[in-house]
């Protein structure tokens, strides 16, 4: 189960960009593997051939995906990487699925909310 989502602040744990803090731009699921594109991380130069009437040729910088295991959720209050957990909260007749900070126990955000059916 993926506990991170688009727009989350993350810190890079390994590689040439180790220690960089940024936000997730995209999550890619392919062949049972999960990769993420992080803003300003794993930037490479790509040489593009010109296509007449479509684009100019040249060198452009693009962000390549990195494995999700190489990033961790970054808690901006404590300025440290933390593990994210899932918890179900029952309030009256509502059930909410929330993401929590495993270290402090505080709620990061709600994933979904449903109303309990009466039997």
UniProtKB/Swiss-Prot annotation:
One of its GO terms (cellular component) is ribosome. It comes from the Bacteria. Gene3D superfamilies: 2.30.30.30. SMART domains: KOW. One of its GO terms (biological process) is translation. It holds the Pfam family ribosomal_L24. GO terms for molecular function: rRNA binding; structural constituent of ribosome. Keywords: Ribonucleoprotein, Ribosomal protein, RNA-binding, rRNA-binding. One of two assembly initiator proteins, it binds directly to the 5'-end of the 23S rRNA, where it nucleates assembly of the 50S subunit. Belongs to the universal ribosomal protein uL24 family. Part of the 50S ribosomal subunit. This is Large ribosomal subunit protein uL24. It comes from Sulfurihydrogenibium sp. (strain YO3AOP1). The lineage of its organism: Bacteria, Pseudomonadati, Aquificota, Aquificia, Aquificales. The gene is rplX.
């Amino acid at each position: 189960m993926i506990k991170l989502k688009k727009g989350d602040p993350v810190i890079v744990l390994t590689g040439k960009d180790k220690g960089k803090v940024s936000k997730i731009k995209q999550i890619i699921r392919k062949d049972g593997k999960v990769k993420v594109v992080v803003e300003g991380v794993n930037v490479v130069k790509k040489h593009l051939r010109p296509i007449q009437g479509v684009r100019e040729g040249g060198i452009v910088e693009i962000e390549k995906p990195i494995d999700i295991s190489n990033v961790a959720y970054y808690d901006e209050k404590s300025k440290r990487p933390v593990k994210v957990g899932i918890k179900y909260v029952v309030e009256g007749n509502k059930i909410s699925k929330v993401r929590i900070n495993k270290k402090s126990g505080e709620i990061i955000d709600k994933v979904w909310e449903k109303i309990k059916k009466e039997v």
